[in-house]
């Protein structure tokens, strides 16, 4: 049995859950999400808990058991609390600002980089160097954070670029020079 898959998922009182034809739907104070559950996996509601079970003992079902449990847990947590990812910009003259719903990055290119988030995601900029990405879908929040970071990832010599808050960038020593 999967160690992750056999753990129970608590359902907060403000969250309603429905399971119909292998589609798991959850509704909470922050919004509504649904996910297709693969064949061989079943989600069962027991009082105020959810249990993810394997219907079939196939290799695929055993592989997907823990994954489905984590995805269902993320859906429940997303509609109840939401998810947040923070990025920081380091570098002289590097800054970010909001233009309506769009994020405008001035990060050393000859032109500003404009990023338009999906409708489910909210972006905020704190003091021109910190970007906050909020949403109810953990996958979308992480994907957008990775896309923003990929515009100018931190370089190893000076550490300039966009990084996750608290990310440790391995630094390299520059060349030794003439003697």
From Swiss-Prot:
Domain of life: Eukaryota
Subcellular location: Plastid, Cyanelle
Keywords assigned: Cyanelle, Plastid, Ribonucleoprotein, Ribosomal protein, RNA-binding, rRNA-binding
Pfam family, one: Ribosomal_L6
GO terms under cellular component: cyanelle; cytosolic large ribosomal subunit
Oligomeric and partner information: Part of the 50S ribosomal subunit.
Protein name: Large ribosomal subunit protein uL6c
Taxonomic lineage of the native organism: Eukaryota, Glaucocystophyceae, Cyanophoraceae, Cyanophora
